[in-house]
């Protein structure tokens, strides 16, 4: 088992995603290792809530990470808009912008039209709840083999930021060392916004017990704040003074009453 902190590649931000499989034993260590954002699994299909989602959100946000949640789609259960609302319900009164649709599996008889319809209705469910713009997560192989050809015709879906999962190895630890290691086939998207480059058998994340998915966000920290609808560093707030870094997040969470953070 080998631990590795954030990559800190120029022009990128490091992030993680977690579920009940991981134990976040030291959230401060996660932040000190350089990770800036996290997605916690909220739900799976219509009936399942991850039992640790709210604890993960509370712990990671208190350490200074920007947080959101993801919903693992179970397309055979139908009702995609309700699956979106289930994720929000499981997350509770927490910061919910950039909720992620995790669409990576489906019965073999589901075609690309049916899958794209599901995805569009999921994001519509987020819109109905005022949850902000969502993010589309999938694997390269699922994108190419299951979502094509219909995805190329779905302007609304292509407008969603793409969180692409593609690993160089499933058996040994690997991490990119330069931007040339990050090129992926993303059509019909111009490029990925987030890349999950490591999961099981990857490098361990400081402060977390168990394999943990590692991600890169394309952009600077200022871009990451803007992505989540947060103001730039140094923004003056009504309470007085100038706030810096992730202090912005705590202030906004308090003012919007979006989370049980203390």
Regions found by a protein language model. Name each.
Residues 2-19, 153-262:
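Functionally critical loop-and-helix segments that line ligand-binding/catalytic clefts
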Residues 3-133:
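Substrate-binding cleft of extracellular glycoside hydrolase catalytic domains
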Residues 26, 110, 146-147, 204-206:
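Short, solvent-exposed polar/charged micro-motifs at secondary-structure junctions
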Residues 45, 75, 141-142, 202:
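Positions that flank functional sites
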Residues 50, 139-140, 213, 220:
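Alpha-helix initiation/capping motif
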Residues 59-60, 77-78, 110-111, 138-145, ...:
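Noncatalytic linker/hinge segments flanking ATPase motor cores
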Residues 68, 135-137, 219:
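Intrinsically disordered, low-complexity segments enriched in small/polar residues
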Residues 98-182:
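Catalytic domains of cell-wall/extracellular-matrix polysaccharide-remodeling enzymes
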